[in-house]
Every structure is written in structure tokens, then in C-alpha cells.
Swiss-Prot record:
Gene: fbpC
Gene Ontology biological-process entries: transmembrane transport
Assigned protein family: Belongs to the ABC transporter superfamily. Fe(3+) ion importer (TC 3.A.1.10) family.
ABC transporter domain ranges (all copies): 4-236
Biological source species: Yersinia pestis
Compartment(s) of residence: Cell inner membrane
Name of the protein in question: Fe(3+) ions import ATP-binding protein FbpC
Length: 349
């Protein structure tokens, strides 16, 4: 049985459809990331799951029980769902301990014991318990918000872009710590984000949302390497898209012959490669004949660790852009050999 099931969820505001027949299953103890651009409907979907809003159609099932099905509506505070908002939303007039313990029942001793357990769980120094929210760092504030959400022993944790306000280094470390914590506690979770890297690294199930629909749902590696369509491919990362003629397990394209992930397709198709699949080797003139594909570097856009190279394929004159790790031996006018690792992905007809 799934922890959460969404069946044909629909939602409109006046004449604007925000969610269009959303179906999603969240397995027990799993981490799901819903990723999409601003305005795609992901936050509205999260609010419907939490019980802050009701859908116009569909069913929300939590651990086999209907939270909403058109006749049944269970309010947010009775769903057993934890919620961590984007800014943490800590109570400024409560200490760290007061925030974590908000809503806990029992004796003062029991509350203190539970607060200490939760602080240990989210790796917060107990000495912070008497401090006010403004006296601790952004990363610590997010851990307090998570501890407060965990205090009620939720069956599902919802995370609404909780790392977006943190700096890059802190965002990555906090994200990893939260993912490990939720896994250890065996709590299913849903992260909403517009950051593709965050979604791919946090989740074991990624759902790409576009214009109120889930375009593709599956494991992160599947979505990255075998996306359902070109918009999903480009949204999840840098790509090289090429038109090719297919036959006998190979694509004949501007880069020469490339292995493909569907050897049975024939005819013309669009194929995709990720930048890390393409290896560039600077060549001397006497090495040209041994290269499977020759290209000339006609422009370099340096951006620190990564550079964008504009290459002109010598055999066809076609130009392509690829991103690669910046190297001192690459310069405009250089002739390079291109080699492809792995298979190109063929998009469905």
C-alpha cells in the first residue's frame, strides 16, 4: 500500500486550470521530488495534499484512507502530515525549544525529553534550545522547522522549497542531511522545488510538472537519461539535440554513427546526448584520419569550472554547442576529435 495516492486531481482558479488530472503514488519511506518552473502548479498540489486547499476533482488517499474524495474531507490538522515551508516560518516569540515543542502534549519532563530527542535527530546542538530564531543560522532554522514537523510523528513529510534561501554550500549539505534523516526515520516525503539538481539528488522518485500536468514520473536516472520528451530533457539539464537517421542500432547524425537506446527504431528521429557523454580530444593534423568525428572550435564562453564551446562539424559544416569542463588546451581555431560514450536517447514518435 502506498503512503499517498493521488487520483485524477484537478484544480482551477476561475477559468484558469492549475492542475489537470494529476495521478501520483508515493511509496512508504520514499522520497519524491516534484520539480517544475514557477507557475506549473507544484505548490498548489502540495497544499492540496496537506489539506490547506481542496481540489475540484479527484481523490487524496493517505495510508488507504480518503482525505478527500468529493464527499469526504479531512482537515489539515487531522491528516498526520508534517509541513516545512520555504522560509521555515518559525515563531519569532518562541525559543528554539519552544518552536520544536509547539503542540506537544504531556508533562513538562516528557516534552523536554522529546525536544532533546528531536534536536539530536536533526543534529542540532542542545545548547541552542534557549536561543531565539534570529540568533541562529539559516541552516539551523531549517533544522528547527524540520524538528517541529517531526515532533508530531507524521506519516508523510511535505517540504516546500525549504533550502532555497540557503547559500549553495549550505543548501547541499542541509539537503543531504534531511534526506538521510527522513530515510532513517522511514518517513515518506515530498519535496517541491524548481531546482533540477536538488530534485535529482534528493529523490528516489522525480515528478516533472509542466502546465499543471505531470509530464514524466520515475527514478531520477531514468528521467535524466531517458526523458519522455524534449522539454523534459532540457528542463532537467544541458542537452545536445540532433536529428538523425536510425538503422541497425545506430543513429547516423552530425557526429557520425552513435549507438542508441532503442535498436528497433527506423527512419528519422530526434536524439539526445548529455554533455558528459561527449569527449573532446585536441588533435594534430596527422591524427585527423583516425578520428571518428572532427570539429573546429569557433567560440568559447568561459564560465569558470564550465565552458560552453561552439563547434563546427568539419564534414557537414553544422554547428553545435556543448558544455565541458574548462581546459587550458582548448582554444578558438583548434581541431578536436569527438567521441561519444554510452547511448543516445531516442525520443518517442
Amino acid at each position: 500500500m502506498s503512503t499517498l495516492e493521488l487520483h485524477h486531481i484537478g484544480k482551477s482558479y476561475q477559468s484558469v486550470m492549475v492542475l489537470d488530472r494529476i495521478d501520483l503514488h508515493v511509496p512508504p519511506g520514499s522520497r519524491t521530488a516534484i520539480v517544475g518552473p514557477s507557475g506549473s502548479g507544484k505548490t498548489t498540489l502540495l497544499r492540496i495534499i496537506a489539506g490547506f486547499e481542496t481540489p475540484d476533482a479527484g481523490k487524496v488517499i493517505l495510508q488507504g484512507k480518503a482525505m478527500f474524495d468529493g464527499t469526504t474531507y479531512v482537515p489539515a490538522h487531522k491528516r498526520g502530515i508534517g509541513f516545512v515551508p520555504q522560509d521555515g516560518a518559525l515563531f519569532p516569540h518562541f525559543t528554539v525549544a519552544g518552536n520544536i515543542g509547539y503542540g506537544l502534549k504531556g508533562s513538562q519532563r516528557d516534552k523536554e525529553r522529546r525536544i532533546n530527542e528531536l534536536m539530536d535527530m536533526v543534529a542540532l546542538d542542545r545548547r541552542l534550545s534557549a536561543l531565539w530564531p534570529h540568533e541562529i543560522s539559516g541552516g539551523q532554522q531549517q533544522r528547527v522547522a524540520l524538528a517541529r514537523a517531526l515532533a508530531q510523528r507524521p506519516v508523510l513529510m511535505l517540504l516546500d522549497e525549504p533550502f532555497s534561501a540557503l547559500d549553495t554550500a549550505l543548501r547541499a549539505s542541509t539537503r543531504k542531511a534531511v534526506a538521510e534523516l527522513l530515510s532513517e526515520a522511514n518517513i515518506a516525503s515530498i519535496l517541491v522545488t524548481h531546482d533540477q539538481t536538488e530534485a535529482l539528488s534528493f529523490a528516489d522518485q522525480v515528478a516533472v510538472m509542466r502546465a499543471g500536468k505531470l509530464a514524466h514520473v520515475g527514478p531520477p536516472q531514468e528521467l535524466y537519461l531517458r526523458p519522455v520528451d524534449e522539454p523534459t530533457a532540457t528542463f532537467l539539464g544541458e542537452t545536445l539535440m540532433l536529428t538523425a537517421q536510425l538503422g541497425t542500432g545506430l543513429a547516423h547524425c552530425a557526429l557520425g554513427q552513435v549507438k542508441v537506446d532503442n535498436p528497433h527504431r527506423r527512419g528519422e528521429a530526434r536524439i539526445m546526448l548529455r554533455p558528459e557523454q561527449i569527449t573532446l580530444t585536441p588533435l594534430r593534423p596527422e591524427q585527423y584520419n583516425a578520428a571518428s568525428c572532427l570539429a573546429k572550435v569557433i567560440a568559447i564562453d568561459f564560465a569558470g569550472f564550465i565552458s560552453t564551446l561552439t563547434l563546427q562539424i568539419i564534414s557537414s559544416g553544422e554547428t553545435i554547442e556543448i558544455k565541458t569542463i574548462s581546459r587550458e588546451d582548448l582554444h578558438v581555431g583548434l581541431t578536436v576529435g569527438l567521441d561519444i560514450m554510452g547511448q543516445a536517447h531516442i525520443f518517442a514518435e
